[in-house]
Amino acid sequence: MSQFSTTTSGDYLMALDAGTGSVRAVIFDLNGNQIAAGQAEWLHLPVPDVPGSMEFDLTTNWKLTCQCIRQALHQANLPASAIRAVAACSMREGIVLYDRSGKPIWACANVDARASREVSELKELYNNGFELEVYQCSGQTLALSAMPRLLWLAHYRPDIYRQAGTLTMISDWLANMLSGELAVDPSNAGTTGMLDLVTRNWQPNLLEMAGLRADILSPVKETGTLLGHVTAEAAQECGLLAGTPVVMGGGDVQLGCLGLGVVQPGQTAVLGGTFWQQVVNLPKPITDPNMNTRINPHVIPGMVQAESISFFTGLTMRWFRDAFCAEEKLLAQRLGIDTYSLLEDMAARVPAGAYGVMPIFSDVMRFKSWYHAAPSFINLSLDPEKCNKATLFRALEENAAIVSACNLAQIAEFSGVKASSVVFAGGGAKGKLWSQILADVTGIPVRVPVVKEATALGCAIAAGVGVGLYEALDKTGEQLVRWEREYQPNIEHKALYQAAKTNWQAVYTDQLTLVDSGLTTSLWKAPGL
């Protein structure tokens, strides 16, 4: 992009991306090109005798982060002085506690579910009205919020609870380890259920209502504002130059949307990863009267995002590939192509509608009472010409699109914001058939960007804004995104999929009754149900 200086000036930005399964340090030039990346997998291990726990190992994970930073610098063949700024993003919901001297003392990952009993306990407060109060203020329910975890600590680890002086998110912990400064940003801290959607600041009254300490809330700074600078100690550990600016990052989904240029009211994205997120930018804070949809602060000040989640969509495809497609994996390896590409080629020869096969995996999002039916395929036939791996694979792709369309319809119903097009990103967007199916099911154009994993790019944009290399978050996101292809909906298929969606919804409702009666096991249940 001509408005940005080229890499010959020696200006680069670093994003630290702390995901559920790995941490990455990614270096970008000012045109948004990825120059290098260091990556390390990490594990969140359960605490012995604490069901559902997933501890975040602060010591090991900081060492892994430093390893990634050095790896990225080495791969890019750049001196540390070339990095003009660094920012961090992370999985949301994961929290870190610090003692009163600012030392990190405890952390859990986003998938930590130890506080199921505490979720139920908090739901009963104020004649079962506390969760509604939390949702109307923060856009979050209790199942994934920080308050049940804090209550668990008060019950079972009072030593840590008493020591705690500050709470942040995992992205903020990375920034703290670099700079020594403590703060949170609205996009990530909003997922604690303790931040006001309107003011974009903490709502300590919610903690007080729950009988929890409200004196552990750190300062709130917007994404893209300067937090501090890399300390001499951190520089020695990670290889960055002491004094390098450290800028506020944010939540992975919101920064991913920034990297995709999804920054204006009404814009919509489907992020196709392990989970699929359907995200719609809302012009002002509003919540869903039915509490089906999550509402998060965007990284763009004043804007919120309605977010629905399809559960384990990418994981389901991986399970199908690994459980049933050993032959295709070997063939793809010999051909030098991706197994999913081969499966898509096979599925493309199956008629739209997949001969009526109905996958039962993720439900539409019901944030207040979030659980799913038992995984299954319904309406199979014994005709091997019509019911085979290609048919089942196509049915899974169609079903993922149907669940996404249902979630987008729920958002439109309460917000009045109806998508006119969809940005499709993440690993799922690599599938050309899947992209076309998503266009056909939703009935609107689907745009696929060149950079499909845009979280780190969004984080780098925040770093650049924080030191004045970019003018503003929204403008830069729009300027840096590049499009690979666009899919127009097939109207004939749209009508077919509308009927399939209606049938699937009815069958799924029946399948939930089997879980309710204890005859089958839910794919997943939220803590406290």
Swiss-Prot record:
GO terms for molecular function: autoinducer-2 kinase activity. Keywords: Cytoplasm, Kinase, Transferase. InterPro entries: AI-2_kinase (IPR033676), ATPase_NBD (IPR043129), Carb_kinase_FGGY (IPR000577), FGGY_C (IPR018485), FGGY_Carb_Kinase (IPR050406), FGGY_N (IPR018484). The lineage of its organism: Bacteria, Pseudomonadati, Pseudomonadota, Gammaproteobacteria, Enterobacterales. GO terms for biological process: carbohydrate metabolic process; quorum sensing. The keyword Cell division does not apply. The keyword Magnesium does not apply. It is found in: Cytoplasm. GO terms for cellular component: cytoplasm. Its EC number is 2.7.1.189. It holds the Pfam family FGGY_C. This is Autoinducer-2 kinase. It comes from the Bacteria. It is an enzyme of class 2 (transferase). Belongs to the FGGY kinase family. CDD domains: ASKHA_NBD_FGGY_AI-2K. It catalyses: (S)-4,5-dihydroxypentane-2,3-dione + ATP = (2S)-2-hydroxy-3,4-dioxopentyl phosphate + ADP + H(+). SUPFAM superfamilies: Actin-like ATPase domain (SSF53067). Catalyzes the phosphorylation of autoinducer-2 (AI-2) to phospho-AI-2, which subsequently inactivates the transcriptional regulator LsrR and leads to the transcription of the lsr operon. Phosphorylates the ring-open form of (S)-4,5-dihydroxypentane-2,3-dione (DPD), which is the precursor to all AI-2 signaling molecules, at the C5 position. Its main location: cytoplasm.
